[in-house]
Amino acid sequence: MKQGIHPKYDLVTASCSCGNVIKINSTVGHDLNLDVCGECHPFYTGKQRDVATGGRVDRFNKRFSVPGTTKA
């Protein structure tokens, strides 16, 4: 392999807004500030909300549905 073509890996500290600090090897070269991490992200903590916003299909079905019929 050629010498000197590979990036230099440094020890970087990634700090989350929740206070979690993660030390990783990265080519970025400076410390990182994260908005969310695995400790505070709603998907991983189980505090996930179901956002049921009607889209174009729901609007179409509401506009062109036949009154008096029910969905099976």
UniProtKB/Swiss-Prot annotation:
Zn(2+) binds at residues 16, 18, 37, 40. One of its GO terms (biological process) is translation. GO terms for molecular function: metal ion binding; rRNA binding; structural constituent of ribosome. InterPro entries: Ribosomal_bL28/bL31-like_sf, Ribosomal_bL31, Ribosomal_bL31_A, Ribosomal_bL31_sf. It comes from the Bacteria. Binds 1 zinc ion per subunit. HAMAP family: Ribosomal_bL31_1. Binds the 23S rRNA. Part of the 50S ribosomal subunit. Belongs to the bacterial ribosomal protein bL31 family. Type A subfamily. This is Large ribosomal subunit protein bL31. The gene is rpmE.
